[in-house]
Amino acid sequence: MDRLLSLEPSNVVTIRLEPGQKCSGVLTLRNVMYTMPVAFRLQPLNKIRYSIRPQSGIISPLTTITLEIIYHLPPNTTLPDSFPHCDDSFLLHSVVAPGATAKDTSSTLDMVPSDWFTTKRKQVFIDSAIKIMFVGSPVLCYLVRKGYMDEIREVLEKSDTTWKSVDSVNFEGQTLLHLAISQGRPDLVQLLLEFGPNIEAHSRSCSSPLEAASATGEALIVELLLAKKASTERTEFSASGPIHLAAGNGHLEVLKLLLLKGANVNSLTKDGNTALHLAVEERRRDCARLLLANGARADICSTGNGDTPLHIAAGLGDEHMVRVLLQKGAEKYIRNKYGKTAYDVAAEHGHNKLFDALRLGDSLCVAARKGEVRTVQRLLENGASINGRDQHGWTALHRACFKGRIEVVKALIDNGIDVNARDEDGYTALHCAVESGHVDVAELLVKKGADIELRTSKGITALQIAQSLHYSGLTRVLMQGGATKEVGTMETNIVKSSGKIAVRDLDIGTIKKRSVNKSRTRRSSFDRNAPLAVL
């Protein structure tokens, strides 16, 4: 027989280390003898660091006794290279004790005479296979910081199931997930997720794991957490939610993942800002465009100071973002809690280049549409951008030509406006003049160098519009100006209904009708009051 006692559950004793708590583990000894009691004595080689209760005793046949091994952690101890395993050794002596009687374990500490275990008197079995393995929060935090994958798995598997070892926290209140995320280790995160951690646990700084990953831009980790149903919304403990942190830090891929999982694009931070506010403030243009494309409100006010994203862009002097926000329908005349519009904020910071987009461009547009030449001249002298465009790409020249304001057209041309500027559908001022039937305006444009052959995005020339609408005078002006007539006979049908005009070419293609919002119609009720934006 090799031994009198078996070690349960194994020869490895796990000792849980926790700050301010007794550090101990248990070992069960089983007497494998059927008829004889067995005496035992367990001794640590390092008696300063360990104590055992009971250290010796009698075990009846086929019964067990549980020992407590207490670890006395010295201050400022340097962890061994073998950590979480320990090189400390123990000696277990056991000997058959005929006629001995087992007593209450609480009274068996050193109750067995030491001479029972001398080989001169009896056959003594000596076992040195007992090993120590440390578990606990400090152990796991240390291993995660070091990135020791195998050791982390082993400690998690060996830990007592009565405490949730995977939810261990360090002295800063960070969970193991937070530590793994801070190191940018998706492999560690995936390992921890196998053991079912609380993925909504907040650190002492009040951030959830998903918020932490969103802030650092760890897209793969974010994907892993979202796969485990991590909440995309800000909790009451957090200052900012995942979408705010991703947008404010410019993490576009993370932002895409959050939006795909249904994150509320207009949710507010604790101080009342949306993700769009933060993206604009940090000049994260790609993130701002993505948010706008996913339904972010361009004119939402902060519950703090009442600023809209446009106020912020104006204060920064960000021309590009001002243009993007205006194109997405931002209302430029909203006032914040201090009674200021975006224009007022731009003026306060000396961003003169934004004046046209935020105010002067509107006035120039209105003056051009109404034919107010003096007002046009004054606005241009005060800094209005002559080539400024509205959200559809129209310049003041487009508007003046559409309305037939020839004196304004002359003034704009004399001041150097681009006569061939195109809107978002490829229409030039000449297209607008022809479609509206203004012969004198079209003739002036041709004389001033307008390109007669330019086509819209649908491939339509000004001459095709004139012929399709049977404008003989305009057709003559364009032909005399050098317009090229299309080869072949062009049959057309004119459809006029609800303020829409569509020209259909039955031989060489179709000139599709344009939408009410963007079409150039001849109805006096057509709204051309949309603001200009500066490019």
Curated annotation (Swiss-Prot):
Protein topology in the membrane: Peripheral membrane protein
Signal sequence, start to end: none
Membrane is among the record's keywords: yes
Organs and tissues of expression: Mostly expressed in roots and, to a lower extent, in shoot tips, stems, leaves and flowers.
Domain of life the protein comes from: Eukaryota
Pfam families assigned: Ank (PF00023), Ank_2 (PF12796), Ank_5 (PF13857), Motile_Sperm (PF00635)
Alphabetical UniProt keywords: ANK repeat, Cell membrane, Cytoplasm, Membrane, Nucleus, Repeat
Principal localisation: cytoplasm
Subunit description: Interacts with EX70I at the periarbuscular membrane (PAM) around the arbuscule hyphal tips.
Protein name: Protein VAPYRIN
Lineage: Eukaryota, Viridiplantae, Streptophyta, Embryophyta, Tracheophyta
Gene for this chain: VPY
